[in-house]
Amino acid sequence: MYSTNDKPCEDICFDEAHINKVVAEILKNFEPYFINFVETSAGSTISLEQFKELQKKFGSSSSIQKSSVDYTKSLKDIFQKSIDSFEKDREKYIELLDEDNLSEYQYDPTQFKSQALHNECPIIRGTLMNTKAKELDRYRKDFKRADPNNLLQVVMNLSDFGHSYQKNYYNPDNYLKITSFKDLNMELLDTDDYTYYGVIGGGIKTLMLYKLDPEVFSYRSKSAIWSLYYLTNKKVIDCRQDSEFLIIDVKKVITKQNYFYPYQLFAKYAFEVFKLLNNKAKELNVYLNPQYRYVIVDAFFEHIAKIHETEISELSHELKEDGYGYGTMGF
């Protein structure tokens, strides 16, 4: 568990042997979450286990049976619904990261800030408009003070990285054979050139890239980091303090997801989770379109966080959030 004054994570977290241990732990805990994911249609119904518990609780006749789940149909439905949801506001992000549009804004960065970011970027607009959430007051202040030129430059850098990644780094024939996080080539996204602290942090910038190209970019959301905490069974693996996926707010004395967690490491674990999901899909004769690779991963992460939402709320003492988890999800 990390103080807000500490580094994003301990040095051991970048060690390949450590990463292999984390992946092994994820593998051990994956199956029950996947079964629940499919049996409940990603949380839209109850699982067989939950059905039996309700029967016991209310003394219902054991002759009443829950319909068996067609795993193949359920996974297909989950994937299609996830894509449909993903696409709803995707065009807004594609327009935001359009290189020609960004070039035009170089003549008027203030317009970029007030129009493209404030009014047209869904996650930023939603955050700024959510005035009931007092914990977002600081974000609103930081956005108001943010320099338009620097904001534009960060988004231009993200756009350039996002549009050039497939050409520079991605080989679809060898992608699933990658073993080291370094070979995913995401380390630049953890640098200052791709961050505007307080306004465009790990959550927002990875959402932008995820919406641009979910074939290669995973979304490092609040739910995703929490889900890795649970997929590793809350274990402390090699670290001196506590789980690398948690952070302690010293001033408020509350536990949150590690919103400083390096994207280059997160991308590796999201990649490994995709491989597990893809293997299950093959067993069920379900095709997961690689162009939407990380959409199914995000849906899985969201489901795990939903399962544990009561405990997460108790740990973080935060108000329930809407949409993308506006708040400390990585600004």
Identify what each model region corresponds to.
Residues 1-196, 215-225, 229-331:
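An N-terminal alpha-helical hairpin/helix-loop-helix interaction module that forms a charged
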Residues 204-210:
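Short, small-residue alpha-helix embedded
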